[in-house]
Amino acid sequence: MAELATIARPYAEALFRVAEGGDIAAWSTLVQELAQVAHLPEVLSVASSPKVTRKQVAELLLVAVKSPLAAGAEAKNFVQMLVDNHRIALLPEIAEQFEALKNEREGAADAEIVSAFPLEGAELDSLVSGLERKFKRKLKPTVEVDSSLIGGVRVTVGDEVLDTSVRARLASMQAALTA
């Protein structure tokens, strides 16, 4: 996985430099759409077929996305470069790194919140507000439910984890008692 990140990083950084000259959010949408299309087994199969030219593969990828940026020269050149270098499979990792660069520029971060129970509305807003104060940045939350936590939440922001779940507390107590 780290190897894919290393290979994808220069592509994500180059695309981000291009995006800085325009609408970063629109470029983010484009690269997310390209990543979704490139992740499809059918597309990967067509891309590796010797009967299909590289130009046709690039056109297939661009036609499959809805973003109006796909018609632009920069997007066409980017996709063609990925196809020529056999890097289509890297698009999901490129999209992830592009999003990280975008978040860094905005002073934001993705927050993965795992809760024992569904979080919605004011409860979620209150939690996110508190987490933003703790992490000192704007958070973009995604919420998952995992009943095995018993209660509480586990929050992951970048490489930081805040685990206030009952399961984590029980594990901590067990470790203290058996030590």
UniProtKB/Swiss-Prot annotation:
Subcellular location: Cell inner membrane
Keywords: ATP synthesis, Cell inner membrane, Cell membrane, CF(1), Hydrogen ion transport, Ion transport, Membrane, Transport
GO cellular component: plasma membrane; proton-transporting ATP synthase complex
MF term (GO), any: proton-transporting ATP synthase activity, rotational mechanism
Quaternary structure and interacting proteins, as annotated: F-type ATPases have 2 components, F(1) - the catalytic core - and F(0) - the membrane proton channel. F(1) has five subunits: alpha(3), beta(3), gamma(1), delta(1), epsilon(1). F(0) has three main subunits: a(1), b(2) and c(10-14). The alpha and beta chains form an alternating ring which encloses part of the gamma chain. F(1) is attached to F(0) by a central stalk formed by the gamma and epsilon chains, while a peripheral stalk is formed by the delta and b chains.
PANTHER family listed in its UniProt record: ATP SYNTHASE DELTA CHAIN
Protein name per Swiss-Prot or TrEMBL: ATP synthase subunit delta
Species for this entry: Burkholderia vietnamiensis (strain G4 / LMG 22486) (Burkholderia cepacia (strain R1808))
Classification of source organism: Bacteria, Pseudomonadati, Pseudomonadota, Betaproteobacteria, Burkholderiales
